[in-house]
């Protein structure tokens, strides 16, 4: 009787806890990242205050961490070693093209994510000419689909693909010179992923990790394309020395 009661509560929670898609609260994600998602990054130009480092230069990549409580509409993005390696690999074409001399991860636990000046100072201590500040936030939309009607059966609870977990990761990249006030427009990208299965086995964290991987790929591609463009549009070295 006790087992039957436990199974009844399990089935009820599975069928009623996430019945309808709620979508993503992108406004909350943008607030955490301090960005305006409606801005058109392609039409914005880098700051003319100071000069962009002369190529090839050393780039330090700083992965920011935020402390906020996880809930359905907002998830903290954890930057793993694999994530850092993926981004560095994605930026490798800039080294092949002699725009960058070196790319490395800037690790400094004393620096706060929102303090760009402190991050630039840390970059200078480690020999960087510019720093790329990477930030991110995630969200999960978990809901039932048409197969959820099978959940009241014991077999259906474990086998019916009645639950979907949509994941969104919004990532930003902000490029700053270390020894001048030059900085580029913040780049905003998104990665999405979906997991489908029984409510017992659908893993929200796996969907979020997959979306993060997509976001990192999009961000590295965006930075490569934009930095190539910014270098072409920057004044020649003779003008920068005047």
What is each model feature region?
Residues 157-170, 176-222:
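Short secondary-structure boundary motifs at beta->alpha junctions and helix caps
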Residues 48-51, 161-163:
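A generic local secondary-structure boundary/capping motif
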Residues 224-242:
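Short, highly charged C-terminal tails/helix-capping segments
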Residues 1-18:
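Sec-dependent bacterial lipoprotein signal peptides
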Residues 16-37:
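Bacterial Sec signal peptide processing site at the extreme N-terminus
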Residues 113-179:
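Surface-exposed short loop/turn segments
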Residues 55-142:
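N-terminal segment of the mature soluble domain
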Residues 38-50:
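A short, compositionally biased domain-edge/stem linker segment
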